[in-house]
Curated annotation (Swiss-Prot):
InterPro entries: NADH_UbQ_OxRdtase-like_20kDa, NADH_UQ_OxRdtase_20Kd_su. It is found in: Cell membrane. This is NADH-quinone oxidoreductase subunit B 2. The gene is nuoB2. Binds 1 [4Fe-4S] cluster. It catalyses: a quinone + NADH + 5 H(+)(in) = a quinol + NAD(+) + 4 H(+)(out). It is a peripheral membrane protein. Keywords: 4Fe-4S, Cell membrane, Iron, Iron-sulfur, Membrane, Metal-binding, NAD, Quinone, Translocase, Transport, Ubiquinone. Its main location: membrane.
Length: 174
């Protein structure tokens, strides 16, 4: 009879510190919204009452990067805007995550010219890519759910996994 069985008989729940910390991180993510183009409209739609991102622990959007732990880059990033994105990312406390929302944020989209960064991952490390032009709110919610799963697998030591790419939304609307 192991300690887990004895603890279970006494009504004691056993878990690891990593599980508890990661559960807290997933249920209290505070996003810094960085809407740069048409994807920002869909990002706002995801926070409306139809989809309600507060179900996922995102009650408030943060205007200050010092209070945020998730940056959602929605839209194309110009070369002039890239240092601002990097500065905001650097001001965020650890642990921090980035979602690239839309084709423009992921790979430059249809704007293949000198003025547009061909993917925000040239500026900041991206954890989840959400495809679409613009992606629907369901796709952003899928990306957030995938990020939650990724955070639950992380070690407290801070070693991060490789990025997740979402090509098709997991949630289907009828």
């Amino acid at each position: 009879m192991g300690i887990e069985e004895k603890a279970g008989n006494l009504g004691i729940v056993t878990t690891t510190l990593e599980t508890v910390v990661n559960w807290g991180r997933t249920n209290a993510m505070w996003p810094l919204l960085f809407g740069l183009a048409c994807c920002a409209i869909e990002m706002m739609g995801a926070q409306a009452s139809n989809y309600d991102l507060s179900r996922f622990g995102m009650e408030l959007n943060r205007a200050s990067p010092r209070q945020a732990d998730l940056m959602i880059v929605a839209g194309r990033v110009s070369r002039k805007m890239a240092p601002v994105v990097r500065r905001l990312y650097d001001q965020m406390p650890e642990p921090k995550w980035v979602i690239a929302m839309g084709d423009c944020a992921a790979c430059g989209g249809i704007f293949n010219n000198y003025a547009i960064v061909q993917g925000v991952d040239e500026v900041v490390p991206v954890d989840v890519y959400v495809a679409g032009c613009p992606p629907r709110p369901e796709a952003l919610i899928d990306g957030i759910m995938m990020l939650h799963q990724k955070v639950m697998r992380e070690k407290i030591s801070g070693k991060k996994e490789s990025p997740i790419r979402i090509d098709q939304p997991l949630v289907q609307v009828k």
